[in-house]
Amino acid sequence: MSKVTVVGAGNVGATCANVLAFNEVADEVVMLDVKEGVSEGKAMDMMQTAQLLGFDTNIVGCTNDYEKTANSDVVVITSGIPRKPGMTREELIGVNAGIVKSVAQNILKYSPNAIIVVISNPMDTMTYLSLKALGLPKNRIIGMGGALDSSRFKYFLSQALGCNANEVEGMVIGGHGDTTMIPLTRFATYKGMPVSNFLSEEKLQEVAAATMVGGATLTKLLGTSAWYAPGAAGAFVVESIIHNQGKMVPCSVYLEGEYGESDICCGVPVILVKNGIEKIVELPLNEEEKAKFAASAAAVRKTNAALHEVGAL
């Protein structure tokens, strides 16, 4: 029996669990939250859609009961707080690092062989923290960010082309942040052909810029962070793993010399299989793209330094 746990039953976590259940990715989906009754209520609400939507996945909600997460194949961590007015970057990292570290350690007690997918922000840094705190092999700790950023990139490309998003291929690498992500316009295709055959360089740069502020744009419109696409992106990564699909998906993973970087988690294309990361795919970047990736990694590394400042590592 396949089992997935989603820690954090907020907007993103609940959406992720709902997509996993609807697509019958696993036989059982467990939602765990610290707030009494929230995950139980959302699980019951979702289960009451099963006959309407035609899925058989069992959804279980629990409040801080990690025993119910036992023997999970994949665990998705969405826990953490959003940055509040007046809160410094270090303060946010300090709070979320404590939450994510505690969650990861509790999960490992009951699911020692689980693959861990991190959605909590700052995502690259929380992925790095999880890897270092747990001491797991790098193939088992995966940050979701690149999958979400690439989906947004493909959306903006499809809007510019006037086509369906499924007709477009595109990828975003680098850090999961407004100034650190790198939409690879040179590699993007439409019906198998380079998008540069259809869009001007100016238009491609507009698409890249829209992608980079995609999350911020939604926050401005919604008054809070987005949840449908982040939750679905998390579920997409989980499905690729659970079903051993061998898909190439951009994810934040631990680098040991790939793309010229080491001791850092950053977004790069990887092949996802049942055991997590099968391999990191190294794209033939040009000099400009290499420079952007180096700058992105430097920014992520600066954020990682705060983990030591707050005593998380």
Stretch-by-stretch model annotation:
Residues 1-4:
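Extreme N-terminal starter segment of soluble prokaryotic enzymes
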Residues 32-72, 301-310:
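Conserved N-terminal Rossmann-fold NAD(P) cofactor-binding segment
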Residues 9-10:
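Glycine-rich Rossmann-fold phosphate-binding loop(s) that bind the pyrophosphate
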Residues 88-154:
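Rossmann-like NAD(P)(H) cofactor-binding subdomain of soluble oxidoreductases
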Residues 134-140, 149-313:
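C-terminal substrate-binding/catalytic lobe of Rossmann-fold NAD(P)-dependent dehydrogenases
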Residues 52-114:
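Rossmann-like NAD(P)-binding element
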Residues 13-14:
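N-terminal Rossmann-fold NAD(P) dinucleotide-binding loop
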